Regions:
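Flexible, glycine/charged-enriched surface loops at secondary-structure junctions
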Residues: 1-5, 59-63, 83-90, 112-120
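Gly/Pro-rich interdomain helix-loop hinge
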Residues: 12-96
Length: 131
């Protein structure tokens, strides 16, 4: 089983001529939020990331800690690294998202062997969050 679904999702670099790192910086917080909104099994991982990596204060409400982790990551990317956090900041629209979702899933209906399974529709929705 692979956990590289985030890298599979990162189609911005080939579709819009962005660097892979910038694409991942825009994508990762949205991917995390998308998963957290739909799959409570990610709460512990994302909360642990928040505490251990982003310096979020640990408390009993792990879901709140997980959301704080995502916010802290997005703020770090924008404020500390000075990178855009939305595709619209780069003048990018959604005109290529349909093709990107197919490429992200390697032409299949979904990425079942990902950290968490993602369908093409999931990929499309995450891309929309990046606008």
């Amino acid at each position: 089983q692979t956990q590289a679904s985030l890298h599979a999702l990162e189609q911005f670099s080939s579709s819009y001529d962005l660097t892979d790192g910038l694409g991942l910086a825009i994508l990762m917080p949205k991917w995390m939020k998308y998963l957290l909104d739909r799959d409570e099994t990610v709460i512990d991982d994302f909360a642990r990331f928040g505490v251990n990596v982003m310096g979020v204060e640990e408390n009993e409400d792990k879901k709140a800690v997980a959301y704080q982790a995502i916010e802290a990551l997005q703020c770090f990317i924008k404020d500390e690294l000075g990178l855009p956090v939305h595709l619209s900041e780069l003048g990018i629209d959604d005109s290529r998202f349909e093709k990107m979702k197919v490429k992200a899933c390697y032409g299949q209906e979904s990425l079942p062997r990902a950290y968490r399974p993602l369908t093409q529709e999931d990929c499309f929705n995450i891309y929309k969050m990046c606008l």
